[in-house]
């Protein structure tokens, strides 16, 4: 799990199911988007000290909406009436687009 600090690795490892695999990581400002074999996780910087908001999990189903607004460098994740936004740096746009493309492929292949 590249680009993750040791505390972030520990928090993420604790949030994963025993047999869950991390497939794609995409950095964002103050957070990282994590696509596993069964869900999307938004892991915020400092998650180890804020367990209620530091890690958000979204099931890979057709309720999940992920929108990228490249002009303002914002990613919005919404599902089941809740939504969060993260910002990305221009140099990470390709990583985020790849993660979202893979996420959509998985959702709509089912």
What are these regions (language model features)?
Residues 80-99:
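Canonical phosphoinositide-binding patch of PH/PH-like domains
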Residues 36-37, 71, 79:
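Short loop/turn segments that connect beta-strands within the blades of beta-propeller domains
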Residues 32, 50-55, 83-85:
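Short, mixed charged/polar active-site loops
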Residues 1-33, 98:
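Anionic N-terminal interaction surfaces
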Residues 22-24, 31-32, 56, 64, ...:
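Residue-level detector of beta-strand structural context in well-folded domains
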Residues 44-47, 77-81:
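Short acidic, glycine-rich loop/turn motifs
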Residues 40-41, 52-72:
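Phosphoinositide-dependent membrane-docking surfaces
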């Amino acid at each position: 799990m590249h680009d993750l600090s040791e505390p972030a690795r520990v928090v993420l490892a604790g949030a994963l199911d025993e047999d869950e695999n991390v497939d794609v990581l995409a950095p964002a400002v103050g957070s990282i988007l994590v696509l596993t074999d069964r869900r999307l996780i938004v892991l915020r910087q400092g998650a180890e000290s804020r367990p209620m908001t530091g890690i958000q999990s979204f099931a890979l189903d057709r309720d999940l909406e992920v929108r990228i607004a490249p002009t303002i460098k914002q990613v919005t994740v919404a599902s089941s009436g809740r939504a969060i936004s993260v910002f990305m740096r221009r140099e990470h746009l390709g990583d985020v687009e790849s993660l979202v493309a893979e996420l959509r492929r998985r959702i709509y292949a089912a």
